[in-house]
Amino acid sequence: MEELGRNVDVSIFRILRFMNLRKYIGIDNEMLMYYFGKELSKNLNFKNFKELSNFYKEYKLGRIEMVSENPIKIRIYDCISCSGLPDVGKPLCHFEAGFLAGYIENVFNKKCYIIETHCWGLGNKFCQFEVRLVDNKKSENCFASSGDCNGYFGKNRTKKL
């Protein structure tokens, strides 16, 4: 590992990230990336936002900040998945959504719904996620770009600033 280094070029990460997995294994990469991120975050078992923020910084995933705690809004600058990409009319950060959902669910011991409201893919210069805690632990997970979370966030929540 010392000879190879710890860093992977962002273009290699994005090639893997945006591959058409449905063509090869019959699964949408959006949901797969969401669950990869969620599982990774749950296994890392961050105890607080500082640990999460330090991990993002150390592994060069982006710069993360808590915008508000009620409702929970988390912003990522220099996001590894989308920073610098053109406006494609949709959010792109499924891995990050899952990663944040795993963190939130560990800390609060509740399921959550998460929506990416800002993204380079939507024409913004940062990513922002809004989280809603769900009291019922048996409720379905939901990342709003893959469904409407039963209307939990209302309509047209993705926007440009």
Swiss-Prot record:
InterPro entries found in the cross-reference section: DUF2507, NO_sig/Golgi_transp_ligand-bd, V4R
Origin superkingdom: Archaea
Cleaved signal peptide residues: none
Pfam family, one: V4R
Family of the protein in this entry: Belongs to the M.jannaschii MJ0150/MJ0739/MJ0745/MJ1460/MJ1642 family.
Full protein name: Uncharacterized protein MJ1642
